[in-house]
Amino acid sequence: MPTTYFHNPRCSKSRAALALLQARGVEPQLVAYLEQPPSIAELGTLLRQLGMTDARALMRQGEAEYKELGLDNPALPQEALIAALAAHPRLIERPIFIHGERAVIGRPPERVLELL
């Protein structure tokens, strides 16, 4: 079954979760999402795979960009939130491990093992 990993090599949690997968023989396709941001369509699929209905659940709400862009406004439609994630990939929570049709955010890193 294909596996994909949205990875930020500068993030300790991302490195730790990847090491857990590799220790179990899993070599996922790595996506450097900061350099290659997912499209709006890909983000929609990712939200479904994560079982999320609110794009804010995928956002790093502590990032300065979150407030600067007004993403804390509860009146914003989901489409606007997803577009913001595509345009500002630093806002995407990480790491994300995709195994088949399911995905999980690796926080704590051990969560990635739930899909194996």
Residue ranges, per PLM feature:
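Conserved dinucleotide-binding and phosphotransfer motif residues
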Residues: R24
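Thiol/selenol-based redox catalytic cores and closely related redox-interacting motifs
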Residues: Y33-L116
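Local sequence-structure signature of Cys/Sec-based thiol-disulfide redox active-site neighborhoods
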Residues: M1-L20, P28-Y33
